[in-house]
């Protein structure tokens, strides 16, 4: 509402979510016309994350907000960049790869062999971000 009051159009906005924020970003970006979407260390669903941490616990029954991003990403029509570190100790790397696989085109990825959950904003990552943003113009 605030953006509409300021007359800022969706197509001029890039949605960026990191970790838990990727669930929110995926939710917001569905069926919208944003300039782009960037997901850093995304998860497939909170159920999947819970199962990796507590495999014998009935996670599905305990979660109110399941953030099933793997089911919602197909509804994102904007260009998307997925970034994930292979040594992420919080959100398993396979989840980022799966989210990339499920995403619609145009889609881009930056997978780092050395980054953990909080990715290092080094020159290589910044160049990938610039490349993605430049592709939106």
Region locations from a protein language model:
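Post-His helix in hydrolase/transferase enzymes
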Residues: 120-134
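Short alpha-helix in the alpha/beta-hydrolase fold that links the catalytic acid
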Residues: 69, 78, 92-101
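Catalytic histidine neighborhood in serine/cysteine hydrolases
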Residues: 97-118
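Active-site acidic short loop of glycosyltransferases
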Residues: 10, 34, 77-78, 105
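Mobile cap/lid helix-loop segments that gate and shape the active-site cleft of serine hydrolases
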Residues: 35, 42-78
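Acidic catalytic loop of the alpha/beta-hydrolase fold
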Residues: 86-91, 116-119
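Primarily recognizes the serine-hydrolase "nucleophile elbow" in alpha/beta-hydrolase
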Residues: 2-54
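Short beta-strand/loop motif that positions the catalytic acidic residue
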Residues: 75-77, 82-88
């Amino acid at each position: 509402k605030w953006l509409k009051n300021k007359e800022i159009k969706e197509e001029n906005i890039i949605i960026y979510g990191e970790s838990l924020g990727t669930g929110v970003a995926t939710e917001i970006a569905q069926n919208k016309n944003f300039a782009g979407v960037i997901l850093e260390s995304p998860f497939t669903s909170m159920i999947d994350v819970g199962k990796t941490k507590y495999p014998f616990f009935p996670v599905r029954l305990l979660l109110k907000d399941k953030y099933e991003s793997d089911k919602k990403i197909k509804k994102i029509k904007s260009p998307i960049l997925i970034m994930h570190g292979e040594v992420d100790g919080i959100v398993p790397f396979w989840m980022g790869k799966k989210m990339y696989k499920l995403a619609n085109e145009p889609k881009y990825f930056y997978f780092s062999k050395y980054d953990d959950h909080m990715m290092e904003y080094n020159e290589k990552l910044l160049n990938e971000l610039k490349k993605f943003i430049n592709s939106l113009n």
